[in-house]
Amino acid sequence: MSFDFLKYIKKVHFIGIGGISMSGMAEILLKKGYKVSGSDSTKSPIIDKLINLGAEIYIGHKAENIKNVDLIVYTAAVSEDNPELTKALTNNIKIMNRAEFLGYLMDGHKYNIAVSGTHGKTTTTSMMSHITVNANLDPTILVGGELNIINGNVRTGKSEYFLTEACEYKESFLKFFPYIGVILNIDADHLDYYKDINHIKNAFSKFANLIPKDGYLIACAEDENINDIIKNIDCTIITYGLNKGDIQAKNITFDNKGCASFDVIKNSSVLFSVKLNVPGSYNVLNALASICVSFALNIDKESIIKGLESFHGTHRRFELKGVRNDVTVIEDYAHHPTEIKATLSAAKNYPSNRILCVFQPHTYTRTYSLFEDFTESFYNTDTLILADIYPAREKDTGIVSSDMLGNKLRKKNINCINLHSFEDISDYLKKETKPGDLVLIMGAGDIYKAGDLFLK
């Protein structure tokens, strides 16, 4: 089956339409003239936007929400006994999971760019969004964060270019059709699905092998897990790194907010220089990946430079949320030990007196499987406030808790306290912060609410 099957589809229903990826696909269909309906558990600004675009959306999942539907798309979080999914199966309505449907949307384009990696997918895809828009490629874009340049997280273009993130969870990126595949890094994560790091590496190897012979693999040369899997890939490989790779960054300097400037090097020659407006050394690597993709697409250096310099970050990626009594609040999506360390390192370069980190662990499985790594991740903070674990799709079995993590961190002499409500966190911050402090709100769940309360 190819993208052409959509010629026979008039109405698509999305179960879980409020998610960032599902809403983006729904918006693409609406702008292409399809009828769209959907359901979600709660209302949100994303849902309001889709309603304004013409979508028919229900709050709550009920069988009667399925009306004259040709196709149903559902997320991995939807349970098998979901009444809408049950009705679809009973009535022989075609169903697809989110990744499969995104793959079919991609299949209608010639130049599909899929950005994979345990960390940095949204930021790198966002950088590429700025570059491709500045290069007038008129791309279709689906990204996991909101961007000012496209007024949201989705852009519906009319060209052959399609740019999206490629998530490895449950091997969903194996449903894609990449012409250019990017692997930023490979780390242990999603261990509720993957058995171990070798299982994860095998999935990324399969992803790389999806790229056709005339396509490109963009890979970080400084990640040994990546180096292990790309040796027998049958396409053009472009590698990058700070000290290794075909394309390198040299003469790196940082301004007083931790944003880097650097020279882009190939074969020991300086190609051009770039100034970033997002902090952290990890964003130099993300920018290099974007530059390599640009080279594969023959994008001119002026568009690359302008695209990267015009990028000031995405929603919940080291995002400045506000200031209260000269206390700066920054929010970040970091929820894996590697991401936490990188974000705290970037925060160290930010002008502030003290760093107070508010962290909400994300899922019991991740907290349990990476427990020791979490205990080694918070040395660059003056005070750590731990919220309760955000369960997402999981149930609390009692095997791990934020209190357990806090106890271990305190034994390692980390100044850490456990607070169990957003109100308590906000009250603590109002009492303990001083002018010039930096409050860093971290996590992939709803911890942003604590920051919102503090800023009220």
From Swiss-Prot:
EC primary class: ligase
InterPro entries membership: Mur-like_cat_sf, Mur_ligase_C, Mur_ligase_C_dom_sf, Mur_ligase_cen, Mur_ligase_N, MurCDEF_pg_biosynth, UDP-N-AcMur_Ala_ligase_MurC
Matching SUPFAM superfamilies: MurCD N-terminal domain, MurD-like peptide ligases, catalytic domain, MurD-like peptide ligases, peptide-binding domain
Gene3D superfamilies attached to this UniProt entry: Mur ligase, C-terminal domain, Mur-like, catalytic domain, NAD(P)-binding Rossmann-like Domain
Protein purpose: Cell wall formation.
Species of origin: Clostridium tetani (strain Massachusetts / E88)
A UniProt-annotated Pfam family: Mur_ligase_C
Primary location recorded for the protein, binned into one broad class: cytoplasm
High-level lineage: Bacteria, Bacillati, Bacillota, Clostridia, Eubacteriales
Functional pathway: Cell wall biogenesis; peptidoglycan biosynthesis
Protein's name according to its UniProt entry: UDP-N-acetylmuramate--L-alanine ligase
PANTHER family the record matches: UDP-N-ACETYLMURAMATE--L-ALANINE LIGASE, UDP-N-ACETYLMURAMATE--L-ALANINE LIGASE-RELATED
E.C. code: 6.3.2.8
A single GO BP: cell wall organization
GO MF term list: ATP binding; UDP-N-acetylmuramate-L-alanine ligase activity
Entry keyword set: ATP-binding, Cell cycle, Cell division, Cell shape, Cell wall biogenesis/degradation, Cytoplasm, Ligase, Nucleotide-binding, Peptidoglycan synthesis
Catalyzed chemical reaction(s): UDP-N-acetyl-alpha-D-muramate + L-alanine + ATP = UDP-N-acetyl-alpha-D-muramoyl-L-alanine + ADP + phosphate + H(+)
Subcellular location: Cytoplasm
